[in-house]
Amino acid sequence: MRNIFLLMIFLSSVLAASAQGQVVQPKPTALVVSSRGELTDLEIGDQYDGEAPVTVRLYSNADEVEGYSLTCTWEFFKEGEEEPFLTRHDPDAEIEIRESGVTLIRPTIVYTSRTNSEIFWPFDSEVYEPFRIQLAESGIKVPNAFSPNGDGINDYFNVFDVKSIIEFHGAIYNRWGQQLFVWGLDEMGREGCGWDGTYNGRPVKAGVYYVVVIAKGADGIEYEFRRDVNLLRGYTEGGK
């Protein structure tokens, strides 16, 4: 009789287990999209190094399992701080990071049995290391000359050594204060973008022009440049 009773208990446990699906540990991933549209895939514990702003898309890769309720939590920390500045409760999430420094993104994934409320898989920080998003301090430089002669070198006037700039406005003027060209954040520092030394489609004369650049970095630093720029014609690299 005792053996029959034990067998019944065993069969009951097997039937209860079969009513629930099998839980497999998820492997969260992230996709970082830079302001230039560059894509970087991250696995758990990986670090991204780049410039602000970036968009981070987070994927828990956690499937719903029969017999369990699923809870996914994303906590966002600034490095060195104990309390998160943001918490999301979704299987997938997205955040734009516009501040320089290190942002830690820590996932927690929990499956809870609907039968006995037992937490089957507490995937906490000991299992999942945070994603590290490290964004450089801001910086920007403005040249004082360019040579739009079609040789592929310095053909456009634009800023350079750009790092973590989130606001930008640039303008070129002639000696009488007439505005000849303006450009913004989308063209800032990009190859093949900027002023090509023309106005209304026609080349302007060689000489001195005036540039105004106003920008703001992800670290809160504000930049303002007001200076002359020399437009050189008939000049090639090496002076030939």
Give residue ranges: language-model regions.
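Bacterial Sec-dependent N-terminal signal peptides
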Residues: 1-24
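Sec-dependent signal peptide cleavage junction
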Residues: 17-51, 239-240
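Short loop/turn motifs at secondary-structure boundaries
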Residues: 48, 59, 131-240
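Short glycine/proline-centered coil/turn motifs in the loop regions
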Residues: 63-68, 162-164
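Surface-exposed, flexible coil segments in extracellular/virion-facing regions
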Residues: 66, 71-95
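Residue-level recognition of secondary-structure-to-loop junctions
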Residues: 76, 91-99, 103, 111, ...
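Append "Rare intracellular matches occur via the same short Y/T/C beta-strand/loop motifs
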Residues: 101-113, 210-215
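Short, solvent-exposed loop/turn segments at the edges of extracellular beta-sandwich modules
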Residues: 110-121, 216-220
